[in-house]
């Protein structure tokens, strides 16, 4: 399934477009290089479509397996199509892995168990938690607060208006 991910220019029906700049492309390449030098295996990767211009800032989507929790691929925000997979056996391990980074913008949980869905959502240190999906249904109109070094999202939705409001109390005694 991961191999079917396609990267290319906008206007085509693709899963991923180009990175924002040459600098970001180089940053993503550095993540790939660091992972490979650490012996971390890319177990699957997508493809760049033939229609993609050679000068574009494209990066093949890659799925890395058995990424150590301390490796930068598991600790830093890549902002590119790289996915780090780290196995776990228990909920406690999963929570420790997810909460063991300095970031906490978004988390995802896949389970059919309704009690586990809520239990995990409450334990994960993230401003937004998706259950059985990722990135769908959040919408730009829903506020959320990233945790740690992730903070985008607080300015969305009705709740954000309070940050731009100045309250005033007027007390009048009559008579």
Regions found by a protein language model. Name each.
Residues 1-68, 131:
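ALDH superfamily catalytic-core signature
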Residues 1-3, 51, 55-175:
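Conserved C-terminal structural/oligomerization subdomain of aldehyde/semialdehyde dehydrogenase
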């Amino acid at each position: 399934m991961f191999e079917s991910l396609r990267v290319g220019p906008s206007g085509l029906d693709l899963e991923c477009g180009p990175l924002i700049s040459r600098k970001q492309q180089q940053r993503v390449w550095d993540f790939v290089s660091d992972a490979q030098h650490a012996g971390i295996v890319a177990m699957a990767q997508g493809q760049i479509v033939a229609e993609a211009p050679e000068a574009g800032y494209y990066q093949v989507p890659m799925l890395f397996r058995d990424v150590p929790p301390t490796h930068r691929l598991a600790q830093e925000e890549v902002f590119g199509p790289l996915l780090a997979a780290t196995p776990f056996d228990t909920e406690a391990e999963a929570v420790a892995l997810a909460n063991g980074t300095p970031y906490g913008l978004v988390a995802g949980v896949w389970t059919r168990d309704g009690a586990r869905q809520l239990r995990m959502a409450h334990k994960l240190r993230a401003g937004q938690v998706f259950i059985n999906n990722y990135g769908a249904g959040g919408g730009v109109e829903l506020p959320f607060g990233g945790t740690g070094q992730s903070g985008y999202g607080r300015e969305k939705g009705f709740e954000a208006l309070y940050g731009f409001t100045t309250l005033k109390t007027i007390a009048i005694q009559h008579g």
